[in-house]
Amino acid sequence: MQNTQTPSPMPFGKYTPFQDQIRVELPDRTWPTRTITKAPRWCAVDLRDGNQALIDPMNSERKLRMFTLLVQMGYKDIEVGFPSASQTDFDFVRTLIENDLIPDDVRIQVLTQAREHLIERTYESLRGAKQAIVHLYNSTSVLQRRVVFGMDEDGIVDLALQGARLCRKFEETIPGTTVYYEYSPESYTGTELEFAARICNAVVAVFEPTPERQVIVNLPATVEMATPNVYADSIEWMSRHLDQRENVIISLHPHNDRGTGVAAAELGYLAGADRIEGCLFGNGERTGNVDLVTLGMNLFSQGIDPQIDFSDIDHIRRTVEHCNQLPVGERVPYGGDLVFTAFSGSHQDAIKKGLEAMERDAAAAGKTVDEIPWAVPYLPIDPRDVGRSYEAVIRVNSQSGKGGVAYLLKAEHQLDLPRRLQIEFSRVIQERTDAQGGEVSAAQIFDVFSDEYLPSGSGTPEWGRFALRGTRSVSVVDGADTLEVDLHDDGAENTVRGTGNGPIAAFCAALGSRGVDVRVLDYAEHALSAGGDAQAAAYVECAVAGRVLWGVGIDHNITTASLKAIVSAVNRALR
């Protein structure tokens, strides 16, 4: 097949390929053959990196609500602000400490640049904390060295070392606080690997890590510049070249400029990282930080404990939307409104069959559905595991098929339609969606179903020619039933009789006396609920006046439900 694409008018030539800027070469890489088997250490940076990117930054109420959510979910490293750069951030850190709002197993993290007055102010904000992470950073990339700082490599290293030494100096002013250190060569992805290793090793040496007080070396994709495999190669290279590796925690901080932040984080973790920083639902500058929800739930979907509680995803999303004053998109993985929803007919049919197979397999094993491995097409996880119901899994529009319509009727109204009735009714819904457009809700589907197959509540004219008023079995002779039927026929009340092999055949004969030729072709029934007073649903396929149509009847008496279903089919044929 010929490729008919043509050159675009876009000025792509003004951009330099990444490999021509930074060389990342690791021919003996080992990360591609590794498998993730456990959760990394997590650090939530919603209150700092996420907050700085908001149109309306969080006030104290929203900050506290976000912090409370992160603690409840199980995050143990939480970056809470940049106290030297903002009085609001400083006051928030003090509020957390002075009101004893930080659990003993949670480490707050604060950010600072490598300047003395900023570092001093940072330590002032931490006074009284049990433990804290001081996160020191300075930019190291080729571009920023040239256009922002006007410094060579030695000047950038000196700046970082000055900051590290000042941190150690001011650490002495808060002797009651256990201080851990984190260092970030900001713009790491635009930094030569040899220089990144040089500056990180120099800073780590000043911080003097031990097994009990490891140093975090954070390697941020401040701007995502290449494919995720390149980031992973750089992480494995750094892991090999960092001094005192056993006392160093390699942390990742991916951004999503190229749309591959999650992939970069996962591959970087495979490549030797120990920790990942990000935000809930990927908030952050430009296209956002890596999404901690997606990362955690990806682990969960592989049978790995994320060590974070996502069991009420809608509460998490509502809180994040309130705090950030930004919506979470409908298609955002795991948390969006539509992520567990199928509109496609073939997808709906596969989901319906998958859920039914799960129920059969569980029953055969003598277990509940939750006790057997999840295996449903198009649903990577059970929506109930994150607090969702199955109500929104299948939704109907013009692209939907019989499987989705049938699933909603069964899930919402316990109506288990026979296959040919599913096909027939899906055509009715298709006509409705083609004519009106948009989505049809489960409630609207049932309304259409009722209008089509069940008696209306406003009288017989809208329903059809016949209405069943009552039946009496008159006699049974030689296996043949004679049935007396009270029938409303086109505005008049009539009593007719019919004889046949069973009540259904007798009823068809009674209708014959009114000039209606009806034959039953197929029949199905089931209870709508458990218990002695449960209603039953009957589905009858009939040939009436040269047409083959289904009818539906619902009644506490299964025989009456069957006769109502015949009336339903006849009325539909005669409308």
From Swiss-Prot:
> Pathway, per UniProt?
Amino-acid biosynthesis; L-leucine biosynthesis; L-leucine from 3-methyl-2-oxobutanoate: step 1/4
Segments forming domain Pyruvate carboxyltransferase: 40-314
Q: Where in the cell is it found?
A: Cytoplasm
| Catalysed reaction, written as an equation | 3-methyl-2-oxobutanoate + acetyl-CoA + H2O = (2S)-2-isopropylmalate + CoA + H(+)
Q: Name one GO biological process term.
A: L-leucine biosynthetic process
Which gene is annotated as encoding this protein in its UniProt record?
A: leuA
Where is it mostly found? Answer: cytoplasm
Which residues hold Mg(2+)?
A: D49, H253, H255, N289
For this chain, one GO molecular function annotation is:
2-isopropylmalate synthase activity
Q: Name one GO cellular component term.
A: cytoplasm
Q: Which cofactor does it need?
A: Mg(2+)
Keywords, sorted A to Z:
Amino-acid biosynthesis, Branched-chain amino acid biosynthesis, Cytoplasm, Leucine biosynthesis, Magnesium, Metal-binding, Transferase
- NCBIfam families from the entry? leuA_yeast (TIGR00970), PRK03739.1 (NF002991)
Protein name, please? 2-isopropylmalate synthase
Q: What is its EC class?
A: transferase
Q: Which InterPro entries match?
A: 2-isopropylmalate_synth_dimer (IPR013709), AIPM/Hcit_synth_CS (IPR002034), Aldolase_TIM (IPR013785), IPM_Synthase (IPR005668), LeuA-like_post-cat (IPR054692), LeuA_allosteric_dom_sf (IPR036230), LeuA_N_DRE-TIM (IPR039371), PYR_CT (IPR000891)
Q: Does the keyword Amino-acid biosynthesis apply?
A: yes
